[in-house]
Amino acid sequence: MKLERVSSNGSFKRGRDIQSLESPCTRPLKKMSPSPSFTSLKMEKPFKDIVRKYGGHLHQSSYNPGSSKVELVRPDLSLKTDQSFLQSSVQTTPNKKSCNEYLSTPEATPLKNTATENAWATSRVVSASSLSIVTPTEIKNILVDEFSELKLGQPLTAQHQRSHAVFEIPEIVENIIKMIVSLESANIPKERPCLRRNPQSYEHSLLMYKDEERAKKAWSAAQQLRDPPLVGHKEKKQGALFSCMMVNRLWLNVTRPFLFKSLHFKSVHNFKEFLRTSQETTQVMRPSHFILHKLHQVTQPDIERLSRMECQNLKWLEFYVCPRITPPLSWFDNLHKLEKLIIPGNKNIDDNFLLRLSQSIPNLKHLVLRACDNVSDSGVVCIALNCPKLKTFNIGRHRRGNLITSVSLVALGKYTQVETVGFAGCDVDDAGIWEFARLNGKNVERLSLNSCRLLTDYSLPILFALNSFPNLAVLEIRNLDKITDVRHFVKYNLWKKSLDAPILIEACERITKLIDQEENRVKRINSLVALKDMTAWVNADDEIENNVD
């Protein structure tokens, strides 16, 4: 064998074996290692089928002694697609027998006999022999077979669907928000209205309802109110306006002004968070409702922190059982539209406070100062003089009733047209009731005089007999020890029933018994009178016949 060294462009190529003419034997075979260019070919047949077709090596033409040139017969390695092969299923795993199948060495590659190269080439042949053509359909079938046991659920991804075009019109969105705000007004925390007072005993309940089943139910409810069960705090969901703000940017911009129009809190934590966020924002709040419901831990400095809240549009201000706070003095100049002020159970409210406040609330219609023990006649007179539109006034109390006398009642009757009056526990006497009935009796619809210890039979019973309160619907006269004559109450009530306008008389157990006895007596008298009239009518025919005879 003869070695030739060939140089081209200044570089030496590797020696190439030239087979002599005297050597008729074929070249030795070696394992073929696929090059990157070879493996990158998109073969149209599996590599192992090519190997099997040519018997594991490249065939060479037989030696021709008359020829001076060696002719190497190259196998036909054209990569044509076999249609029958594409239609059949593809064998993805290599055949183990193909590990020992070899290809002949190309011409330009020298013989390699080292053990390391042989081991490397063997592994490469295995990988190369596994090359095959896989169509997308076959890949899908293979994946389906391999993953058939897996059960995948639907992905929990939010589907962003475009809303209807009508919900992108600002005017329509604003009308929707207004409707939601009107519905949300029912969730404003407020004192539950009491249809009837709780009975003082089971016998009292029987006298009130005159039905055993209803009496038991009312008495059971009264007992539960006295000893309420311990109920765990339940965190409520966000309101409807919060959900509207999360729809999109348009709904957010439309909802935000409505969010600050009605501010009501019954959780100290929520109110503290509101104070914190209100100081971080630059937006000015102009609410029409501001209500705090039973926030015992809120103090006056907390209220003073509401520097960005303006009260020009405020119509309803309520601090229900918030004993430590009062409306700041800085609010007084902007309360001209205030119509409803409810501050019960607050010892910080006194005459000086009412004197300064009354000058800024000319449109006030409802004022509740129940259990504000430091208010006297002076403060009530200031309210009566400066609030002519007043319709509801309640200053009932359990302590220090001597501070409120008939002076306050007469002032309200003279300067206002109040319809609901609450003077429970105050020192109102007969003269004050007479004067009030003369001045404003025709406008009164509800009158509460519970525990007014100075009232006697010379005031209310006679006023009812004279129909001094023609539009009265509810009368509360509990714990009036000096009231013993209830005849006019019963007659007035029966007369109202005949007009389909009955009056509700809320009385204590003693007065209720007197009223019940008087009603039975009146019914007996009416029955006797009716029987007497019927007897006279029946006997009238006999007398006529006797006179004719």
Swiss-Prot record:
Disulfide bond annotation, renumbered to this chain: none
GO molecular function list: small GTPase binding
GO terms for cellular component: cellular bud; cytoplasm; nucleus
Keyword rRNA-binding appears in the UniProt entry: no
BP GO terms, sorted: cell division; mitotic spindle assembly checkpoint signaling; mitotic spindle orientation checkpoint signaling; negative regulation of exit from mitosis; negative regulation of septum digestion after cytokinesis; protein-containing complex disassembly; SCF-dependent proteasomal ubiquitin-dependent protein catabolic process
Primary location class: cytoplasm
Classification via InterPro entries: Leu-rich_rpt_Cys-con_subtyp (IPR006553), LRR_dom_sf (IPR032675)
Biased composition (Polar residues): 1-11
Subunit comment: Interacts with TEM1.
General remark: Present with 2020 molecules/cell in log phase SD medium.
The protein, known as: Antagonist of mitotic exit network protein 1
